[in-house]
């Protein structure tokens, strides 16, 4: 029995020893495995942190983009809403269109004293005030021919009024919208005309400059009629020409039509940068370009103009005017398109009312750069006026 159990015991001990040895190896292996896993976790943590920072940066960038797009969309919606609201505002408040047509609230140049035309280089000009109607007062400038500038120094209004009866023709100048009779380009034209030997009488319509009253087409026309009659009462048999520029061409044709109807026409009519009628001009004006193709453009924008009594129908007036007509227009005019001036000429030239009178259209090439208000710079202007006004008498039929 002892011999049998001894090997078993030894085997058991060997197994125990072997088990003890294998247990130590397993523990060592386990420790190594744990160390490896820890190192892997540490390594993983080190690589995960940059990915996490990158993701956060991308999220912030996307957030900023979304915020920017939201603000941009909000701005676009506001602009679109404003764009759509304006036509309805104009339709509901037609007085807005009248303001935009007249622009009498725009006084350029600023800070000039209209009582002192000499401050604008017009040292042979007198400032008057006339009263066409009750509660309406208009400021007037009278510039005499430049050859008299020395004699004019220190003279009073009476002297200037008497000078109208001298042997010099008179031009009644009707300016356009915005600004005053002291506008830079207007003053330069007065100087040119004065140097050619003309008296120049100009004024600010009611509501412009220092003139008192509320602007309207009827009122502007009546102011012009009052000044014309005032000139005729003092000028004897001297020729009186009417010169209208831009919106002033509408006043000019209204005035001349009334004068022809009462059989006291002027000696000639000069239209600088004219249009056919206010509807066509408003539709062609650069201000209207963003709405020109807006659905219902005429109903929203043009009908309120005519419903306010503003027509300035030069094309219609041409049928009732009987006096020499000269039209001046620059091809590069950005305000009143050249084609409207040409169209007006094509209406006037064959009209029966002009059959006994000279009708002339003078274009100025776009290369000259005269645009809307610089035709006075043309060195050809004196010749054009001399040739035309020298033929301003009715042509006899043969």
Curated annotation (Swiss-Prot):
Keyword set includes S-adenosyl-L-methionine: no
BP terms from Gene Ontology: acylglycerol catabolic process; adult walking behavior; monoacylglycerol catabolic process; phosphatidylserine catabolic process; phospholipid catabolic process; protein depalmitoylation; regulation of inflammatory response; response to auditory stimulus
Gene inactivation effect: Mice are viable and were born at the expected Mendelian frequency. Young mice (less than 6 months old) are mostly normal in their behavior; however, as these animals age, they develop an array of phenotypes, including defective auditory and motor behavior, with concomitant cellular pathology indicative of a neuroinflammatory response. Mice show heightened immunological responses. Metabolomic characterization of brain tissue show striking elevations in a series of lysophosphatidylserine (LPS) lipids that occur before the onset of neuroinflammatory and behavioral defects.
Subcellular location: Endoplasmic reticulum membrane; Mitochondrion
Main location: endoplasmic reticulum
Region spans: Disordered: 1-24
CC terms in the record's Gene Ontology section: AMPA glutamate receptor complex; cytoplasm; dendrite cytoplasm; endoplasmic reticulum membrane; membrane; mitochondrion
Annotated control of activity: Selectively inhibited by DO264 (N-3-pyridyl-N'-(1-[3-chloro-4-{2-chloro-4-(trifluoromethoxy)phenoxy}pyridine-2-yl]piperidin-4-yl)thiourea).
Keyword Glycoprotein: yes
Post-translational modification remark: Glycosylated.
Function: Lysophosphatidylserine (LPS) lipase that mediates the hydrolysis of lysophosphatidylserine, a class of signaling lipids that regulates immunological and neurological processes. Represents a major lysophosphatidylserine lipase in the brain, thereby playing a key role in the central nervous system. Also able to hydrolyze oxidized phosphatidylserine; oxidized phosphatidylserine is produced in response to severe inflammatory stress and constitutes a proapoptotic 'eat me' signal.
Family of this protein: Belongs to the serine esterase family.
Protein name listed in UniProt: Lysophosphatidylserine lipase ABHD12
Source organism of this protein record: Mus musculus
């Amino acid at each position: 029995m002892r011999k049998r159990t001894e090997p078993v015991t030894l085997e058991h001990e060997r197994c125990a020893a072997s088990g003890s040895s294998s247990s130590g190896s397993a523990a060592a292996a386990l420790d190594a495995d744990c160390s490896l896993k820890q190192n892997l976790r540490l390594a993983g943590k080190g690589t995960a942190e940059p990915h996490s920072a990158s993701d956060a940066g991308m999220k912030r960038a996307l957030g900023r983009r979304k915020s920017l797009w939201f603000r941009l969309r909000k701005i676009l919606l506001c602009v679109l809403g404003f764009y759509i609201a304006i036509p309805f505002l104009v339709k509901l408040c037609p007085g807005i269109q009248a303001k935009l047509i007249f622009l009498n609230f725009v006084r350029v140049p600023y800070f000039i004293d209209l009582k002192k035309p000499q401050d604008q280089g017009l040292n042979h000009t007198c400032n008057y005030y006339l009263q066409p109607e009750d509660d309406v007062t208009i400021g007037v400038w009278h510039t005499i021919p430049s050859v008299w500038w020395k004699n004019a120094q220190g003279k009073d209004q009476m002297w200037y009024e008497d000078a109208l009866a001298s042997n010099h023709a008179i031009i009644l100048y009707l300016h356009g919208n915005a600004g005053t009779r002291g506008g830079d380009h207007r003053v330069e034209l007065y100087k040119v005309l004065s140097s050619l030997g003309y008296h120049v009488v100009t004024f600010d319509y009611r509501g412009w400059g220092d003139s008192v009253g509320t602007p309207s087409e009827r009122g502007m026309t009546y102011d012009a009629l009052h000044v014309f009659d005032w000139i005729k009462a003092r000028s004897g048999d001297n020729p009186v020409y009417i010169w209208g520029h831009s919106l002033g061409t509408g006043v000019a044709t209204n005035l001349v039509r009334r004068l022809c109807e009462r059989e006291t026409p002027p000696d000639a009519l000069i239209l600088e940068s004219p249009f056919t009628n206010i509807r066509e001009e408003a539709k062609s004006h650069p201000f209207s370009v963003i709405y020109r193709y807006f659905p219902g453009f005429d109903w929203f924008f043009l009908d309120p103009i005519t419903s306010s009594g503003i027509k300035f129908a030069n094309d219609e007036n041409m049928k009732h005017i009987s006096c020499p007509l000269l039209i001046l227009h620059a091809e590069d005019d950005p305000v009143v398109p050249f084609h409207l001036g040409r169209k007006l000429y094509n209406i006037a030239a064959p009209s029966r009312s002009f059959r006994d009178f000279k009708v002339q259209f003078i274009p100025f090439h776009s290369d000259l750069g005269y645009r809307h208000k610089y035709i006075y710079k043309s060195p050809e202007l004196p010749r054009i006026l001399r040739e035309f006004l020298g033929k301003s008498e009715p042509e006899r039929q043969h």
